[in-house]
Design a protein with these regions (language model features):
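Extracytoplasmic metal-acquisition and chelation regions
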Residues: 21-301
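Sec-dependent N-terminal signal peptides of Gram-positive bacterial secreted proteins and lipoproteins
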Residues: 3-26
Length: 301
């Protein structure tokens, strides 16, 4: 009888353990199911587009990889903290077109992560350095980038596909209205020749029928040589309206030298590459492009 009691007690313990194990497995599965879909963006323009597409979608987290003041990713070197951020990402949204020239390192380390190329299928502008990557500064191409990001997110995260599609459509509607407003303002400006700070604005210029006749810095962040400076001075002097455009992310020293030599007036065009990665950034692209529109309207009269 004692043996039978011991056997029954042992069976009861084993059964309880098994049931607890099943409960633990179920809880583990539920926790796994609740794991957020983590999206990392390479830099600010991609962050702004992506938070519009994911706005209000439960279970989705968006993080911008680079710091608020990084700007364009020309010659950007990945840091240890960047790789740690990407380590937990399900998808990495990049501009593409050669902007992120560190991608070999990323794909080598994160083989399971979905790479979302915002510039897929967009016709690129070529210059002496190769493909120009500043695609987002054409509103038409920015719309194409939003569509690309949304379509690829829908593939990577089908559980939220309907929400991504709805948000993308709403944002594209706003961008289309922006495009109409900017064309109405800029298509008729009397002067079309401009001098920009670096090679950020060819897509913008193509969209709004402007001619970039010179750039102040041939290499971003590198002061022009004396001969390059003199060449730009001569080009500005040949303009009927002497204006040149700086960017808030770079030192205006070279532009100020040109202005002193030519009497040109300096204006600022913002390529929308810096800002805080917060939900408030949702309107950053549209707001900044409207400011650029007003600057050009004044400068090119």
């Amino acid at each position: 009888m004692k043996i039978t009691t011991k056997i029954l007690s042992l069976l009861l313990v084993l059964l309880t353990t098994a049931l607890l194990g099943c409960g633990g497995s179920q809880q583990s599965a539920e926790k796994k199911a609740e794991k957020p879909f983590r999206i990392v963006t390479s830099f600010y323009p991609m962050y702004v587009a992506t938070i519009n597409i994911t706005d209000g979608v439960d279970g989705v987290e968006v993080t911008n990889m680079t710091k608020p003041q990084t700007g364009c990713l020309h010659d950007y070197q990945l840091m240890t903290e960047d790789m740690k951020t990407l380590e937990h990402a399900d998808a990495f949204v990049i501009n593409g077109a050669g902007m992120e020239d560190f991608m070999d390192k990323v794909t080598g380390a994160q083989k399971e992560m979905k790479i979302i190329d915002a510039s897929r299928g967009i016709e690129l502008i070529h210059d002496d350095e190769g493909d120009n990557p500043h695609v987002w500064l054409s509103v038409t191409d920015a719309i194409a980038q939003v569509r690309n990001i949304a379509d690829q997110l829908k593939e990577a995260d089908p559980a939220h596909a309907d929400a991504y599609e709805k948000n993308a459509a709403a944002y594209i509607e706003k961008l289309t209205a922006l495009k109409t407003e900017m064309h109405a303002a800029l298509d008729q400006v009397p002067h079309k020749d401009i001098v920009t700070f670096h090679e950020a604005f060819p897509y913008f210029a193509k969209e709004f029928h402007l001619n970039i006749i010179a750039v102040v810095e041939r290499e971003p962040g590198t002061e022009p040589t004396p001969s390059e400076l003199q060449e730009t001075i001569e080009q500005v002097n040949a303009l009927p309206t002497k204006v040149l455009f700086t960017e808030p992310q770079y030192s205006p020293a070279a532009a100020e030298t040109i202005a002193r030599e030519t009497g040109a007036k300096i204006y600022t065009l913002d390529p929308v590459v810096t800002g805080e990665a917060t939900p408030a950034a949702k309107n950053a692209y549209i707001d900044t492009m409207k400011k650029n529109m007003e600057v050009l309207k004044e400068a090119l009269q």
